[in-house]
Amino acid sequence: SFEEALAASRLDSRYIPFTCPDFDLTDDEMMEKLKRDIAMGAKGLKIHPIIQNIEITDKRCERPIKLFGELGLPITYHCGVNDYYKPDSPYLKMTNLNYGKLDYTFELLKKFPDYTIVPAHGGGSCGGELEALSAEVRKHNYKNVYVETSHRGAADILKAVELFGEDRVMYATDWPFDTCDCNIRCGEEALGNDPVAMDKYFYKNA
């Protein structure tokens, strides 16, 4: 929860607390909660289109995105066509894995070209998303698109730096689906020979 992330950040300033919209609330209640979270120290917004069962371009996402975007705070969200539930889970029918498609990101960037946007997993880890996302960023000259490399190996981290530049790629973990140690090792393997790039990846770009 945001409250747990906030508590951790007060114990260790290296933690950067993000919050997320609660779509079970009314729109006004949701926005008031997000405004309170920002006042308490939320530094960014996280949305999970598949688990929260909502398109990132849905009107219910627009107000939270605008709130954070206009304040210059980053917006991140899951990218990738992924199942999260077993075939016999009742929750499987309550989600739509296609909400993770990269097309939604392209639409979002066209609508909010100046916001700081961080598509998770480099746009998705099914194959080809890094290249497609970087091509779209270059085509439209988006200045504030970053990628994080959770669920990515050393080769993909190097590819991300090549495609986006060392100032726009950052470390992340997809815990509990992977581990912090695994992601750290991949980052060190990819960038260990370049201390400047590695410092940006693990710390400064965030």
Q: Which residues does each PLM region occupy?
A:
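Active-site gating/metal-coordination segments in enzymes
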Residues: 1-86
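Short, surface-exposed alpha-helical segments at coil->helix boundaries
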Residues: 2-3, 99-103, 181
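Active-site phosphate/pyrophosphate- and oxyanion-stabilizing loops and adjacent acidic/basic residues
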Residues: 3-6, 106-107, 158, 185
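Short, conserved catalytic or adaptor-binding loops enriched in Gly and charged residues
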Residues: 8-10, 136-140, 190-192
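Conserved beta-strand segments of alpha/beta enzyme cores
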Residues: 14-16, 116, 146, 200
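Mid-to-C-terminal alpha-helical segments outside catalytic/metal-binding sites
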Residues: 32, 40, 158-159, 163-170, ...
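Catalytic pocket-lining loop regions of alpha/beta-barrel enzymes
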Residues: 44, 58-170
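Active-site glycine-centered loops adjacent to acidic/histidine catalytic or metal-binding residues
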Residues: 174
